[in-house]
Amino acid sequence: QQIIYTATQGAHVGVATISPVAPVRYAFIHGPENPDDLWHYDFHHRRGVIVNEQEDLGAVNIDACSLTSPYQAGALRGGTHVHVFSPDGTRLSFTYNDHIMHELGREFDQRNVAIAVPLKAVKVAKKHPREYDGEYFCTLISQTVAYPQKGSDEINKAYEECWIGKQGYTKADGSQQRWAIAFIGDTVSESGEKVADIFLVDLPDDDHAFSLEGDKPLAGTETTMPAPAQGIEQIRLTNTHHRKYPGVLNQPRHWLRSSPQGDAIAFL
C-alpha cells in the first residue's frame, strides 16, 4: 500500500484514474478546502487534480475555476468529475456541472462533457475566494438544453463518455479522425419519455482550435453555459426511440468503451 496524496483543510478526494502511459499520473476529484454552509462538496463544487508519481509537486489542478463575470475562457465554473486520460496521456475528458447555472436554477445546471487540453495553463484573477488556476485549457464539447424538444436530437444531459480508439477512428471516406469522444445523451421521445442514446464529437487536431469562440461564448455568461469551441458539434449515433426497449441502460451505471481501432463502442 502506498499513499500518494492526503487532502487537508477538510477537503476530501476520490474517484482516481491512472494515466495509460509513463510517467505514472493519478487524476482524481478534489473537494473544496475549508467547506462551509455556502460552499461544500457538491456536483458543482469540485475540481480535478493530478499527482505525478515521479514529481514531488503535490496535487496540481487540472481545471481552473472562474466565478466572476466576465468569465474566463479556458476556465470552468464549478464541478468536474471522473477525469479520464486519453490513450496517449496528453489530455483528459470529464463530466461537468456548472455553479453559475445551478444558482440560476437547478434545471439549468445540466451535466455536460468537457475536455482538458495542454494548450496553456489558465490563470484566474481570483476575485472570488473559491476561484483557482489550472494547468490545462478546459472547454465543453457537448451542448445541452433545459427542455429538449420531443423527438429531436436535443439533450439535457451528457455523461459517461469515452475516448474513441487509441488513435481515433477511420471515417467512411477513408480519412483518419485523430481525436473523438462518444458519450451518452438524454433525449426526450415523442411520447415524452427520457431515452438515453449515444452521441459522437469529433475534436480538432490543433489544440489552439479549442480556444476559438463559436456562436456562443466559450466562457459562458451569467445566464448561459460555457459553449464548445468553433466547429465542435455532437452527432447522434444511435436512435432507439421506436424500439420496444429504447435507450442505453442507466442501471447498472457504466461508461462507454471503444475498441482500440475506434470502429466499435460497447454499451449496455
Language model feature labels by segment:
Residues 1-268:
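Sequence signature of WD/YWTD-type beta-propeller architectures
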